[in-house]
Amino acid sequence: AMRPVFEQQRPVFVHADELAQIRHALGLAERFELRLVIVGGADAWRMPELLRQRGVPVIVAGVHELPRRRDDDVDTPFRLPARLAQAGVQYCISRVGGERSASNERNLPYEAATAAAHGLAPEEALKAISLHAARILGADDRLGSLQPGRLASFIVTDGDPLETTTRIERL
């Protein structure tokens, strides 16, 4: 069951928010030669160069969060995707964990919109909840973008999908 992990055919997803947790995960991945994906990554903005150099993607688990520290700017979580994008770190935006996480998936476009309002280009915000996620999961050859031969679920809206007033017209 673990062979694909140790042969680097499958990544290891590690939930790590704090800087020390991320560093520890990076150390373990290096020691055991594992493909690593950081899930959460609240402090990833503090070490983007290292994440980029090691090719470690980050699944940003919630843009709509409070800052981790009292002295962090209030918009620190909102700016995390833009900071990772600017540093060249592979990332996506998701909602992770909790007893109501599935019902909160409907808020994913709002999280992308918040990231767009705080420095992430709107097109990148849409990719952060589609193509980038598929790429991190190794499924971008069949999911994440509208191309011939790929699986797709998509929506038709009456406006910008990143606007809270936009309505879905068709699924």
How would you name each of these model-derived features?
Residues L26, E105-P109, I168:
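Conserved strand-to-helix beginnings and helix N-cap segments that scaffold or border functional pockets
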Residues P11, E49-P57, A61-E65, R70-D158:
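His/Asp/Glu-enriched, well-ordered alpha-helical/loop segment
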Residues L171:
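Short aromatic-centered micro-motifs
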Residues P4-E7, Q147-P148, T164:
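Solvent-exposed alpha-helices and their adjacent loops that cap or buttress functional pockets
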Residues L19-Q21, A42-R46, L131-A134:
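Short acidic loop-to-helix transition motifs that present clustered carboxylates
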Residues L162-I168:
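Short, Lys/Arg- and Gly-enriched loop/turn segments at beta-strand edges
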Residues F13-D17, L34-D43, V63-R69:
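Catalytic beta/alpha-barrel core
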Residues A1-G27, R31, H64:
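Metal-coordinating catalytic core of metallo-dependent amide/deamination hydrolases
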